[in-house]
Amino acid sequence: MKIVFMGTPDFAVPSLKSLINEFGVEAVFTQPDRPKGRGKKLGMSPVKEVALEHNIPVYQPLRLKNEPETIEELKNMEPDFIIVVAFGQILPKEVLDIPKYGCINLHASLLPKFRGAAPLNWSIIKGEKVTGNTTMLMDVGLDTGDMLLKDEVEITDNMTAGELHDILMERGGELLVRTIKGILNNEITPEKQNEEETCYAPMLNKEIAKIDWSLSAQDIHNLVRGLNPWPVALTSYDDITMKVHQTRVEKGDSNKEPGTIISVDKTGIKVSTGKDILVIEKLQFPNSKQLFVEQFINGNSVEIGKVLK
C-alpha cells in the first residue's frame, strides 16, 4: 500500500509518525522552507524534518495547483491514499482524484462544526464543552467532504488552545490509522455533513484579540483561553497595550462600568464586565515577560477605578 502525506506544522508530526510506523509513507509534501527566528535563516517545516529523518522523499511546491510537473510525479506514484494534515494549501480536483481511496483530511473539530482555519481556537472561544478530531474524504469545498470517523475530547473549564492543540495533535495519528484500516476493511460508511449544523472558524488576527468588556466574564474568559498562546487577548491600560494570558470568572456584579478595575491583590486584578467579574491572573506589558499578578504588583502599581479599554 502506498501512502503520500501532506502536512507542515507541529500538529501534523504525530500523524506522520503514526503512518510511518503502521504502514510506511511513500512521499511527503510540505510547505517550502521559510525564514525563521531573528536571523531570518531558512528553516524546514517540522514535517520535513521528520521525513528526512526517515529518508522519505520530500516535495515542497510553492503552490501545488500551479505545478503540473509535480502533479504528474504524484500521479506516477499511484498512491492508494493521500493523507492531509494542516498542509496549508488547497488541493485542486486533479490531485483529489489521484489516490485509489481518495484524499483523507484530519480536521481538528467535530464537523460540520467549525470548518475553517482555526477550529480548535474557536471551539474554546465559543464556549464548547466537547470537541475532537474528524477524518473526512476531501472534496473541492472547504472542509465540506463526507465524514469518516470522529474522536471526541472534553474541553475543561480552564483549558487553553495550546493545551487542546497538544491533545488533538497526539490523538490525530491514531484516528488516521483507524480510518485507513476501516476503509480497507469496508467498515466505514462515509457520512454527509449536515449543512444546517455548520459554523465557521476563520483565521485568527489581532482584531479578534481585543477584549470587549461589555461581554460577560465567561465570554471574555473563553476568548482569553482560545487565544492562548497566540495571538493572546489584548486590552488597554492608560493607552498601553496589555496582553491577558490567564483569567478566571467570579460570580457577582460590581455595578461599575465594564472594564473598571475593582480591586487588586496577589490573587489577581478584578475587573467588572457585562455580567459577573473577570479576574486577571497573568498579564504582560510591552517589552516585558508575562507575569502572574502576584509577581507584577511587587514592582508595579495598578490603579483601582481605572477603566480598561
Swiss-Prot record:
Signal peptide: none annotated. Attaches a formyl group to the free amino group of methionyl-tRNA(fMet). The formyl group appears to play a dual role in the initiator identity of N-formylmethionyl-tRNA by promoting its recognition by IF2 and preventing the misappropriation of this tRNA by the elongation apparatus. This is Methionyl-tRNA formyltransferase. It comes from the Bacteria. It comes from Clostridium perfringens (strain 13 / Type A). GO terms for molecular function: methionyl-tRNA formyltransferase activity. InterPro entries: Fmt, Formyl_trans_C, Formyl_trans_C_sf, Formyl_transf_N, Formyl_transf_N_sf, Formyl_transferase-like_C_sf, GART_AS, Met-tRNA-FMT_C. Pfam families: Formyl_trans_C, Formyl_trans_N. Keywords: Protein biosynthesis, Transferase. Its EC number is 2.1.2.9. The keyword Cytoplasm does not apply. Belongs to the Fmt family. GO terms for cellular component: cytosol. (6S)-5,6,7,8-tetrahydrofolate binds at residues 109-112.
